[in-house]
């Protein structure tokens, strides 16, 4: 079926990965070795890392609730863009509601904090109000943050420039982050007839990825074919029922 999510694939993975960088590199190296049996003229190895996006969001001056929203919906491209538009316009903040909340807050301050209202103590309710009142966001700040995120997701360059481009971006936007080129599993721009590219927006297709992600597209008989993809999924096994967190990284070839 055309839209089926079930695909014929053969894969390999490292379960219980203890050396993240070496194991990430091993999976990519194994994928490249497997290409030796395929006939192709050229191609692209695209590498991304969703962990960098998470680190960026953690550094931005936006309310905690917005950080959670952006991280939760990073995988939903269209909805994520809608969130950025709301962030720019303060669409989630009604000034009238804020004023009413503040009045309720001041009224509750005069009451006994142990008094229960709808199953919660006034103390708990005050704590919630306090968080909302101290977590304001102006429209200008929302626009600035949205612009930073959009600019970040446009970064695309040869892999050997990845750290340089990211650090230039962080410095320009006064983000307290620095990335070393050794952070990436590969630094050669050309491997096995493949151009190696870094992309900040790549890796948003599957929600379970937690770090490095990659795909290999090859040109064969004038057609571009996605033959392999993979990445790190340190939370997937526990999401499927494991009692403990098991780090893992793997890849699969489409048959």
Describe these PLM feature segments:
Residues 61-93, 218-220:
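Acidic, His- and aromatic-enriched active-site or binding-groove loops in soluble protein domains
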């Amino acid at each position: 079926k055309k839209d089926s999510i079930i695909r014929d694939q053969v894969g390999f993975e490292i379960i219980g990965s203890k050396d993240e960088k070496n194991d990430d590199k091993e999976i990519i190296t194994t994928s490249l070795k497997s290409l030796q049996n395929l006939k192709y003229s050229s191609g692209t190895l695209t590498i991304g890392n969703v962990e960098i996006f998470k680190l960026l969001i953690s550094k931005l001056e936006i309310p905690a609730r917005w950080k959670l929203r952006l991280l939760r919906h990073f995988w939903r491209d269209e909805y994520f863009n809608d969130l950025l538009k709301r962030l720019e316009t303060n669409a989630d903040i009604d000034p009238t509601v804020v004023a009413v909340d503040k009045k309720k807050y001041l009224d509750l301050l005069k009451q006994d904090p142990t008094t229960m209202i709808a199953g919660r103590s006034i103390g708990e309710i005050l704590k919630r109000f306090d968080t909302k009142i101290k977590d304001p966001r102006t429209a200008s700040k929302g626009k600035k943050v949205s612009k930073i995120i959009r600019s970040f997701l446009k970064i695309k360059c040869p892999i050997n420039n990845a750290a340089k481009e990211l650090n230039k971006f962080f410095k320009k936007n006064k983000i307290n982050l620095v990335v070393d080129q050794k952070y990436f599993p590969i630094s050669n721009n050309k491997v096995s007839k493949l151009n190696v590219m870094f992309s900040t927006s790549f890796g948003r297709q599957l929600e379970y990825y937690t770090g490095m992600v990659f795909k290999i597209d090859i040109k064969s008989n004038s057609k571009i074919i996605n033959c392999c993809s993979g990445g790190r999924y340190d939370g997937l096994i526990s999401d499927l029922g494991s009692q403990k967190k098991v780090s893992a990284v793997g890849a699969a070839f489409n048959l």
